[in-house]
Amino acid sequence: MSKRIPRFLRNIQLPAGPQGPKGDPGPKGDTGAKGADGFGTEAQYNDIISRLEALEQSSGGGTT
């Protein structure tokens, strides 16, 4: 014989219990492949700056 939970008790949430002890740390992961340093060339930098300035001027912003 199974008993049904009354409707008014179905959505009641009880407070959380105390936190358990911290577990042991896991093993250290493998080091990934070393990539490029992430810095572009001076030509790439100048291209980005000129594009940014063009966008600022076309939108009415910027100080140049």
UniProtKB/Swiss-Prot annotation:
Report the protein name in the record: Decoration protein gp12
- Where is this chain compositionally biased, Low complexity type? 15-40
Its subcellular locations are: Virion
- Span list, region Disordered: 1-40
Q: Which GO terms describe its cellular component?
A: viral capsid, decoration
- Per its database record, what is this protein's job? Decoration protein that binds to each capsid protein hexamer after capsid expansion and forms spikes at the surface of the capsid. Each of the 60 hexamers has three copies of the decoration protein gp12 in its center.
Question: Which keywords does UniProt give here?
Answer: Capsid decoration protein, Capsid protein, Virion
Mainly localized where? virion
Task: Describe its assembly.
Answer: Interacts with the capsid protein gp13.
For the keyword Secreted, the answer is: no
